Curated annotation (Swiss-Prot):
Quaternary structure and interacting proteins, as annotated: Monomer.
Name of the protein in its database record: S-adenosylmethionine:tRNA ribosyltransferase-isomerase
Catalysed reactions, semicolon-separated: 7-aminomethyl-7-carbaguanosine(34) in tRNA + S-adenosyl-L-methionine = epoxyqueuosine(34) in tRNA + adenine + L-methionine + 2 H(+)
Organism of provenance: Acetivibrio thermocellus (strain ATCC 27405 / DSM 1237 / JCM 9322 / NBRC 103400 / NCIMB 10682 / NRRL B-4536 / VPI 7372)
Coiled-coil region(s): none
Gene: queA
Single annotated GO MF: S-adenosylmethionine:tRNA ribosyltransferase-isomerase activity
Function: Transfers and isomerizes the ribose moiety from AdoMet to the 7-aminomethyl group of 7-deazaguanine (preQ1-tRNA) to give epoxyqueuosine (oQ-tRNA).
Class of this enzyme: transferase
Pathway(s): tRNA modification; tRNA-queuosine biosynthesis
Family to which this protein belongs: Belongs to the QueA family.
GO CC annotations on file: cytoplasm
Disulfide bridge partners, by residue number: none
UniProt record, GO biological process: queuosine biosynthetic process; tRNA wobble guanine modification
Length: 341
């Protein structure tokens, strides 16, 4: 299967540059994966499609202010770090810009010297492992001097950083938001719970690999970046009991979907665990846990459009995307939503 099989033509002006005023008033395309039938709704109408006894699975990660602007110790040359993932303790994998010359031993300073970093290793794709040095609590320093990194296709400044967090975000660690969840309000979640829908959580810390283009033509050769995930016992219990009672498992976002498919056994049973996943889901994949998916509209030729194509079929997805373009839906992180039922 070729990467170019997942291309569609998207006018630039349909890339949403800011969120809609009220989270649950974004548009919602409902796609029936069996029949291909499409309905046009508002996101708040999602309650019509989720039944008592179904289980909604949300990713409760929180985006960290992962962009750091600083300078090289000694020369004062400007540098930008983007934190990708914590390897252990104070060692992180980072993207450096400009970073070609940063050899092991190179040192950088951020925020009036309250945070320092030393390159300890060059890793794949030119990223660096760095060790941070500081007094106090790393997360608090990051909150003070870091910037939330918006996706490269969003050029407008975000007035309210909380709009790039889900209302249920809890565990800090992502370089990008799990954007399907941005449409939910607390009131909408309460309404679903009141209707007898179970709400379960997983954690997957989203890396910037989610925006990386697929560089191979045969997608079977593509290797995903690994991302940290965790699923707890109480959430496994909700998911497993839903399955046993004939309810549907509805993943909110490709990140939740990837966790569930990573941890599910051949019978669709999930067990509490944590680790790193590099699962790559594309057409031909047989889903073990996930029945339905709430997601945004994804970039052409991205691993995310491949994942939704695995669930609904490539032709149905590309047809739905072409209709979304005609109907002037808003695309990508701050855009509208799709429910694949």
């Amino acid at each position: 299967m070729k990467v170019s099989d997942f291309y569609y033509d998207l006018p630039q002006e349909l890339i949403a540059q800011e969120p809609v005023e009220k989270r649950d008033m974004s548009r919602l395309m409902v796609l029936d994966k069996e029949t291909g039938k499409i309905s046009h709704k508002r996101f708040k109408d999602i309650v019509e499609y989720i039944n008592k006894g179904d289980c909604l699975v949300l990713n409760d990660t929180r985006v960290i202010p992962a962009r750091l602007l600083g300078e090289k110790e000694g020369t004062g040359g400007k540098i930008e770090f983007v934190l990708l993932k914590r390897i252990n303790g104070d060692v992180w994998e980072v993207i450096l810009k400009p970073g070609k010359k940063a050899k092991p031993g190179a040192r950088f300073v951020f925020g009036n010297g309250e945070l320092k970093a030393e390159v300890i290793e060059i890793v794949e794709e030119g990223n660096r492992l760095v060790r941070f040095e500081y007094d106090g609590i790393f997360e608090e320093i990051l909150d003070r001097i870091g910037i939330v990194p918006l996706p490269p296709y969003i050029t407008k400044k975000l007035d309210d950083a909380e709009r790039y967090q889900t209302v249920y975000s809890r565990y800090k660690g992502s370089a990008a938001a799990p954007t399907a969840g941005l449409h939910f309000t607390l009131e909408l979640l309460e309404e679903l719970a009141g209707r007898g829908v179970k709400i379960a959580y997983v954690t997957l810390h989203v890396g910037l690999g989610t925006f990386r283009p697929v560089k191979v033509e045969n997608l079977e050769e593509h290797k995903m970046h690994s991302e940290f995930y965790r699923i707890k016992e109480e959430d496994c219990d909700k998911i497993n009991s839903t399955k046993q009672n004939g309810g549907k498992i509805i993943a909110v976002g490709t990140t939740s979907c990837r966790v569930l498919e990573t941890v599910g056994d051949e019978n669709g049973i999930v067990r509490p665990q944590s680790g790193w996943t590099d699962i790559f889901i594309y057409p031909g994949y047989k889903f073990k846990v996930v029945d339905s998916l709430i997601t945004n509209f994804h970039l052409p030729e991205s691993t995310l459009i491949m994942l939704v194509s695995a669930l609904a079929g490539r032709e149905k997805i590309l047809e739905a995307y072409n209709i979304a373009v005609k109907e002037r839906y808003r695309f990508f992180s701050f855009g509208d939503a799709m429910f694949i039922k």
